[in-house]
Amino acid sequence: MTITLRPGTTVMFTGDSITDLRRPVDEDETGCAYPLRVAGEWCFRHPDRPVTWLNTANAGDKVVDLETRWQTDVLDAHPDVVSILVGVNDMGWHTLDPDGYVIPVEEFQAGYDRLLAPLAAAGTQLILIEPFLLPIDGVVEAGVASVGPEERKEWRADLDPKIEAVHALAEKYDAHLIPADTMFAELAATTGPEYWSADGVHPTAAGHHALATAWLRLTT
């Protein structure tokens, strides 16, 4: 099953910095990440089907942060399609939090569920993108974090059950799923992970193109 984007459809992207990528907060812009590539390619292919593209992603957001602004930033816009990529900031949060707080997978899944429930009730079509982590060598800067082999190992152990939670929610709400973590692992097997993400978290231009291509495969 694919999503048919008819004339007048409103598509909303939301999440964290991977989706945000320098989106002006005071303008109706899609930013410089994969949403811009999706919108550009779609508009090029289908000039006869105008679609409204919205992006309310915010760098640094976790699921709990999305919850605080969900009504005003997402629900009040009454989008027909909502695409969500969140979880990278929930992953390994204890390595950044001064109190060392670990975000349990149950808390992550319950919060994510609360985001999806009102959208599903309204008949909104949903696209969930797995959070992902590529195995970059050495110590790299990922946002405000310095990530080395030990941190990366902790992050991966924390991320895997959260990916499974996204799978469970996609099944519960009959959402379309983009298995981004699996996709990047397969792509990195031939090129090395740095080709797709310099820090293991934020995609390169090629990484954003890969996400956009996977997204567009879900639409007609």
What are these regions, as identified by a protein language model?
Residues 15, 21, 56, 129-130:
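Short beta-strands and strand-loop turn motifs
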